[in-house]
Amino acid sequence: MKKSTVLDARPTGPLPRRPQQPSPVEVRNSSQVEKNNARGSWRKLSPLGRQQEEQGGLIHSQSQSLDTSFAPNTNTTLGSTDVNLNSGVRDRPSPRHSIMHRRETRPLLPSNPTDSGVYASEDCGSSSAGFPRFSSMGNIDKSRDNGQLPDGLCTGGSEVTHSSAVHGEAITDELLRRLTRCSDLKSVSSAQFQLDFGTLRCVESISARMPQLNSLKLNNSRITELRVLGTNYANLRRLWISNCLVSSVSGVGACAPVLEELYASFNSISDIDALTEVSSTLQVVDLEGNDIRDTDMLKRTLPQLKKMKHLVLKGNPVASSETIVELSHSSEEKGTRQRKVSYSKLIGHLMPDLQYLDDAEISNTSLQKSARVQKKHHSAHVDPLEICIRDEYLFVQECIRECGFDALGASGADEMHGSCSRSNVSLISSRSHQLKQNRPSYDRNRPSVAVRSLRKNSQSTASSGDSTNQGCDGGKPRPSCQRWGPTQRTSRLFTGRVTSVGAPKARCRQLPPLKETPASPSTEGLGNEPGNDGQRQQESGAMMQLALKPVPPDANSTRGERKQQNTTSPICGLTAAKGNVYAFDVCDDDDDELEKSKESLMHRVRLGNSATSQQATFMGSGTAKSTNSELADSGLSFLLHRLSTCTHPSGADPPDQRNEQQQEQPTTAGATSRCLDDLETPGDGPLESLNGTPEKDWEWRRELMQSVVDIRKMTSEAALKERVQGSKEVDGGGLEKVESEDEEDVSPVVF
């Protein structure tokens, strides 16, 4: 058996490191370097470059292509141009560094100083696309074959410049002719220079040497301010100053007063207030990549640029997507509030006529519409949040209405109930204390009170014709005004109105339910219960017991709740009559009527036991004595005894004046007597039997008659006072002296 030897293949020492494979990027870059070395490193040109290549003189042979090496210490002479290079030799950079360096900075420069230079980079699109551009100074490599540079290049020290970049010399006609390749400078309309305005002299003379200059391109030059260009470019309409280290556009109005297009991208401009100097002509402004960050300056400057159509502000701090600007109302408006809007909306509001913003067409119709609205109202503010809240509020209101709850309708119902309630001063204990609890709920779909009353009246008329109430005018059926819901305890009152023929006419209207109020000390114990009848008679006085004839209560009336009807003729003035005749005017205001009735009843309660003495004083006056015959005729002859026992007041009229008054004017006392008779006459609209107990019915009738007598007393006193003073107007009770042409057709109003 043979022995087998097992060898240990494991390494006893550190393994050698595997060579690192080049990354795909390096392989791609290496292949690109070889490809560029084979065909030239700046062979791909823009359309303008290819056009010039076909004409010849712009692209050199491949042997003249630039080298990536740099030898600053060598001296090379190209034709008539001296190139001073240092003797030192730098190491050749890596291929990756070379290709990136060549792709970013290497320009294709013209062989002739007057030819235009064009970038050989693939990126030929910029804000000034189609126009030749120059590279920045100091970033141009030497030719790679024999250290030579293309024609038109000169370098000194470590800086390589184009021969058209003039340094340290004055601007002369010869220099301008050489740069523009035109012998007649006065006919030049466009020019392109790359100049160092820090070392050049007489730069301001360019405007005088080329007066017809229409377009001037100074990209990649060294210009700190536009003031160095001079003034009086009378025909200059387009100006390019991109990448020129410009920090201010001050003096643009003096430099180019008719400027229409300004391309000033990639500078250090932070203040654009000077653009307002050319606001009448400026239409295009390119300020990309500057240092504009003040929104107040934009709000102050942009609205003045009325003809602006194209604006580029991207690349500035103010145009950042996170930037939020604050707007406020004009200083003239009160209640200033700050609101926040975005940058794009700010520009849209400040410039309503703007068509392009940041190379994008403004197509948002809502933004344009809101901007036009703000322009119309001279305000630069629209709050989208407010519009959103308004729409949501309308939607919520619509949902509430669909659910059946209408807060507006409910509040309106409460207001109606509150306005239709009145103080309970006459029938405190007789009215129910559950009026609010028994009040029907508000329903918009339910018929109105008038419609329900007419329907109920028509049904009651059809069932029994005798139960219909008869009115005072022709005996027509009068609908019973009854509220829907629980029956309210009300009263019925008829008021006569003077018509054209002199006949009284009564109308009926229901008063709203009485509102519950706490009983005052003066009205305590004034209930209408049968047990309080004696107490009420003592308070009313002996004169009222004689003046008021008892009305027998209706035997057929049952205990129940009374209804109330009232006319629209409150006691608020006097009706016209010939001479000095006073009568009550007719008004249709229920509120005034209610207040008058309440005041008359409260006046009776406050007087109390003194009513007898006041009535005796009135009956002893001259006016009352002159009406003895009328009182006897009207059935109130029992009052003559009181008239004979009363003495004359000190201020009474003399007998002659009283006789004259008796002849000219039918007295109010006579009207009072006729009123009492009319209340008892069945044919002229009597008080109907109330739906209550006989005692309560009689009590209510007595109170009504008492109020009529008190009102007539007040009227007589006012008439007497007017006669004594001899004036045409009386300040008491709203009385007015009027005259009428026909005494026979007008008679006092009868209640």
Curated annotation (Swiss-Prot):
<keyword id="KW-0970">Cilium biogenesis/degradation</keyword>
<dbReference type="GO" id="GO:0030030">
    <property type="term" value="P:cell projection organization"/>
</dbReference>
<feature type="compositionally biased region" description="Basic and acidic residues">
    <location>
        <begin position="717"/>
        <end position="738"/>
    </location>
</feature>
<feature type="region of interest" description="Disordered">
    <location>
        <begin position="1"/>
        <end position="149"/>
    </location>
</feature>
<keyword id="KW-0677">Repeat</keyword>
<dbReference type="InterPro" id="IPR032675">
    <property type="entry name" value="LRR_dom_sf"/>
</dbReference>
<feature type="region of interest" description="Disordered">
    <location>
        <begin position="717"/>
        <end position="751"/>
    </location>
</feature>
<dbReference type="InterPro" id="IPR040091">
    <property type="entry name" value="LRRC56"/>
</dbReference>
<feature type="repeat" description="LRR 2">
    <location>
        <begin position="236"/>
        <end position="256"/>
    </location>
</feature>
<comment type="similarity">
    <text>Belongs to the LRRC56 family.</text>
</comment>
<feature type="compositionally biased region" description="Polar residues">
    <location>
        <begin position="456"/>
        <end position="471"/>
    </location>
</feature>
<feature type="compositionally biased region" description="Polar residues">
    <location>
        <begin position="662"/>
        <end position="671"/>
    </location>
</feature>
<feature type="compositionally biased region" description="Polar residues">
    <location>
        <begin position="60"/>
        <end position="87"/>
    </location>
</feature>
<keyword id="KW-0969">Cilium</keyword>
<feature type="repeat" description="LRR 3">
    <location>
        <begin position="258"/>
        <end position="279"/>
    </location>
</feature>
<comment type="function">
    <text>Required for the assembly of dynein arms in the distal portion of flagellum axoneme.</text>
</comment>
<feature type="repeat" description="LRR 4">
    <location>
        <begin position="280"/>
        <end position="304"/>
    </location>
</feature>
<dbReference type="GO" id="GO:0031514">
    <property type="term" value="C:motile cilium"/>
</dbReference>
<keyword id="KW-0282">Flagellum</keyword>
<keyword id="KW-0433">Leucine-rich repeat</keyword>
<feature type="region of interest" description="Disordered">
    <location>
        <begin position="645"/>
        <end position="698"/>
    </location>
</feature>
<feature type="region of interest" description="Disordered">
    <location>
        <begin position="430"/>
        <end position="538"/>
    </location>
</feature>
<feature type="compositionally biased region" description="Acidic residues">
    <location>
        <begin position="739"/>
        <end position="751"/>
    </location>
</feature>
<keyword id="KW-0966">Cell projection</keyword>
<protein>
    <recommendedName>
        <fullName>Leucine-rich repeat-containing protein 56 homolog</fullName>
    </recommendedName>
</protein>
<dbReference type="InterPro" id="IPR001611">
    <property type="entry name" value="Leu-rich_rpt"/>
</dbReference>
<feature type="compositionally biased region" description="Pro residues">
    <location>
        <begin position="13"/>
        <end position="22"/>
    </location>
</feature>
<dbReference type="GO" id="GO:0060170">
    <property type="term" value="C:ciliary membrane"/>
</dbReference>
<feature type="compositionally biased region" description="Polar residues">
    <location>
        <begin position="28"/>
        <end position="39"/>
    </location>
</feature>
<feature type="repeat" description="LRR 1">
    <location>
        <begin position="210"/>
        <end position="235"/>
    </location>
</feature>
<feature type="repeat" description="LRR 5">
    <location>
        <begin position="307"/>
        <end position="328"/>
    </location>
</feature>
